[in-house]
Amino acid sequence: MRAIFTLVLSLAGVPVLSASPLKINGSTTVNLPVAEAAEILRAEQKLDIQVDTQGGSAGGISMLGDGQVQVGMSSKPVSLEDRLKYPKCDFHPVHIGEDAVALIVSKDVWENGIRALSKAQIKDIYEGRVKNWKELGGVKPQRIAFFNKEPGRGTWEVFVHWLYGSPKAAPQVNFPEVGGNEETRTKVASTPGALSQLSASWADGRSVFALALIGEDGAPVSPETQNIASHKYPLSRPLFILTNGEPAGGAKVLVDFLLGDRGQALVQKHGYLPLKALHP
């Protein structure tokens, strides 16, 4: 009888929820709206959801590829290399919103007069040629304390792709590494002279500050909503939910919620651009 009922639901287009939990892993950036959506779906639909951020975007892609989770979260597109590495996984990306990677500094750097950097200046810092903020227009001498995002995380890949054209072209560097967004913001806020890459929505303007990027025309472009939506800001990036094939069962319930009005409101609540802001 249960099998017949399940078949009827399936034929009617109603997602059939598995008794096993829906496991989700990946980006700490995408996690914010997803974790809140999961709370709502647990309460309203009794959906058993487990959300983790182990390994960031790279972890979400690899665990989905290995079949350890049913849903991955990623702040970078799935690459051809990822697809070749996991040939049994039919990566299906669902675009849920837009974000940007910002170069953030500690309060003392901001107060030292650093408000914008060019690509050439950032490359000089990353490659170790410039080590003091005064060389970049700071009012007083101050050592640059750079924290590098862990290679493989979506934030790092977007950053080095912009800086070098490809993650593979990025040089090996010897900076302290940071993982998730909370860790990055805490490290930068508590370290004099600090600089790192971070999701723009996490730059609170109190403890850490997002720098503008100086374009080829010499004009600074800040990671503000209109610049991210128009891609005038060069480090704009899409946010994805990933499934193996078309979303089904609990994964479809989650995806449908995130693409609906309530889910898109959560995307916006956490500082990201909802889809309607990209296609008004």
Feature-to-residue mapping (PLM):
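Bacterial N-terminal signal peptides
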Residues: 2-15
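Exported/periplasmic ABC-transporter solute-binding proteins
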Residues: 18-87, 91-280
